[in-house]
């Protein structure tokens, strides 16, 4: 099977990102009762082997979610520490973080937002692709980028990572996140080329 995307289909990747962002914003607005917008500011494709260097040594917090259906693989939503604390504070009704380690409530809030972002993003993809994409239970992660890369992604199983730089805007909090998609490349290309 070919792993080449028809150049005329690249617009579909942008459409996936836009629809995913729109669905995330709707879901966040419904959950929090606060008008939320999400914008994808940049899309990149990187080699999975370069992921550790891309993520760097700084600790990051996020959620990893395996996909049970095409395009398979997994989705990873990562926040830097400052953004993760803002997310947790917003979800907990403005309660300020005490710094240091994350409380159980903060971890739960971050897991919930990561789950909302992942499921919303994937639901947006499903809408564009005209199918369902079932996901597994989200796993909370807090580690250096290099450790995340080595524990969450198998370079032998995945060749590329699609990186979506995202900004969430709400009246009291602006948050930056990165959404990494590690699809089964053959399944992903087949889906894109079949539209």
UniProtKB/Swiss-Prot annotation:
Q: Name one GO biological process term.
A: chemotaxis
Q: Which domain of life is it from?
A: Archaea
Instruction: List UniProt keywords, sorted A-Z.
Output: Chemotaxis, Hydrolase
The record's Gene3D superfamilies line, in alphabetical order, gives: CheC-like (3.40.1550.10)
The consequence of inactivating this gene is: Deletion causes a reduction in chemo- and phototactic ability. Mutant has a 88:12 distribution of forward and reverse swimming (distribution is 50:50 for the wild-type).
UniProt xrefs under InterPro entries: CheC, CheC-like_sf, CheZ_family_phosphatases
Q: Which Pfam families match?
A: CheC
Output one GO MF annotation.
hydrolase activity
User: What CDD domains does this protein's entry cite?
Assistant: CheC_ClassIII
Which PANTHER family does this one have?
A: PROTEIN PHOSPHATASE CHEZ (PTHR43693:SF1)
- Give the family, as the similarity comment puts it: Belongs to the CheC family.
Q: What does this protein do?
A: Catalyzes the dephosphorylation of CheY-P.
This chain belongs to the protein called Putative CheY-P phosphatase CheC1
Taxonomic classification, please?
Answer: Archaea, Methanobacteriati, Methanobacteriota, Stenosarchaea group, Halobacteria
């Amino acid at each position: 099977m070919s792993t080449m995307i028809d150049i005329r289909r690249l617009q579909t990747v942008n459409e996936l990102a836009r629809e995913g962002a729109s669905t995330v914003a709707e879901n966040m607005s419904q959950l929090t009762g606060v008008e939320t917008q999400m914008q994808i500011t940049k899309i990149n494709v990187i080699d999975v082997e370069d992921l550790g260097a891309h993520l760097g040594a700084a600790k990051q917090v996020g959620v990893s979610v395996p996909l049970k259906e095409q395009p398979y693989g997994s989705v990873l939503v990562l926040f830097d520490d400052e953004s993760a604390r803002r997310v947790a504070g917003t979800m907990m009704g403005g309660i300020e973080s005490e710094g240091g380690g994350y409380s159980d409530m903060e971890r739960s809030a971050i897991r919930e937002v990561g789950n909302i972002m992942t499921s919303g993003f994937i639901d947006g993809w499903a809408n564009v692709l005209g199918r369902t994409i079932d996901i597994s239970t989200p796993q909370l992660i807090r580690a250096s980028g290099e450790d995340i890369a080595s524990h969450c992604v198998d370079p032998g199983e995945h060749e590329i990572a699609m990186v979506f730089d995202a900004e969430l805007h709400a009246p009291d909090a602006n948050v930056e996140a990165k959404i990494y998609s590690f699809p089964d490349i053959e399944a992903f290309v087949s889906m894109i080329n079949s539209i």
